[in-house]
Amino acid sequence: MSDAQQVPAIVILGQGALDTARRVQARYPGALVHGLAGRVEADRSYTDFGDTLRELYCADHPIVALCAAGIVIRSLAPLLQRKGAEPPVLALAEDGSAVVPLLGGLAGVNRLAREIGEVLAVAPAITTSGELRFGTCVLNPPAGYVLADLEQGKRFVADLLGGQPVRVEGTAGWLDAARLPRDPAAALAIHVTPSARAPRAEELLIHPRCVLAALEPADAAADAVRRMLVDAGLA
């Protein structure tokens, strides 16, 4: 997980899941295990599983639920048509034998699943086409990078999956290991640049986070820094 992303909430229904939950918790300092009241002693107790998942989801909090995937899907289904935050959500078998990413492909759920899979020594059940084919999700850059336009990015990846080649302009080490269909003469381009501009057609524009400014929380200089970035043409 990136440094900026919250640690997951680990939600269990009974005592049988507690050992696995504690193993996952050890991977994420600060993570809490939420347990059903009267069934298991955990860090926090809840009385309604569905309400708890929905509250965490609406708060944009990553969720690791140790139960059947169907229970998680039915609990969150009323929220899935709403636009807004979609945090990573995955289902984990109580015995740690299966790790299933469900939601949040653009929020790092596959990365979370791989991390948990390493802890439990199991391969996560990743189904994201782009990640399986290219070895990375170009729409979910690692810490230190950000997409300029997510919606354009979705169309871009659809073209890649359709078989179009791509060229990479700029430097990003995480792209070097990707299994992208590269062609220096390709019409599609991944452009890594700090320059603030609108993406061109057939381009995936990625900005590296390369400016550091130390300010107090209420420092009026924050607005001045933003203006300086705009004046310098930096994203």
Annotate each predicted stretch with a short phrase.
Residues A4-I10:
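Extreme N-terminal starter segment of soluble prokaryotic enzymes
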Residues L13-G30, Y46-D48, T52-L56, P62, ...:
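Conserved mixed alpha/beta catalytic, RNA-binding, or beta-rich assembly cores of soluble enzyme
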Residues G30-R44:
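A short beta-strand-loop structural module common to alpha/beta enzyme folds
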